[in-house]
């Protein structure tokens, strides 16, 4: 994917599910890191911090927080957006628990970016006009 994006650097891409790191073995996570680093080279890539369930590994909250934190570090907090993937994520965690996990990851690596990751980046990436609050 990263090589394809090199040919179209103006293309904006929003990567779902934190790059989907299903294989949680050391080799699998290293492959995920390499892919994420390659995608990080393209400024048009934004990562949705969502859904870390894996058919290959049991739900592990601490491991998921670490993956979220690493994704934020690799891509940069200005190119990450919060997402939930509910109702699917609800198979493993409540919405409140998922939000708390993402907030813990943000606090580990970019506490100053909480507002950006949870709100501002999505407004920018999706070009939302929300100058007026919903009534």
Report each predicted region and the residues it spans:
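Residue-level detector of flexible, active-site-proximal loop/helix-junction positions
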Residues: 20-22, 87, 124
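Tryptophan-centric aromatic hotspots in well-structured domains and transmembrane helices
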Residues: 31-35, 59, 63, 86, ...
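Short Gly/Pro-enriched loop/turn and capping motifs at secondary-structure junctions
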Residues: 52-54, 86-89
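Mid-to-C-terminal alpha-helical segments outside catalytic/metal-binding sites
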Residues: 69-70, 74-81, 90-135
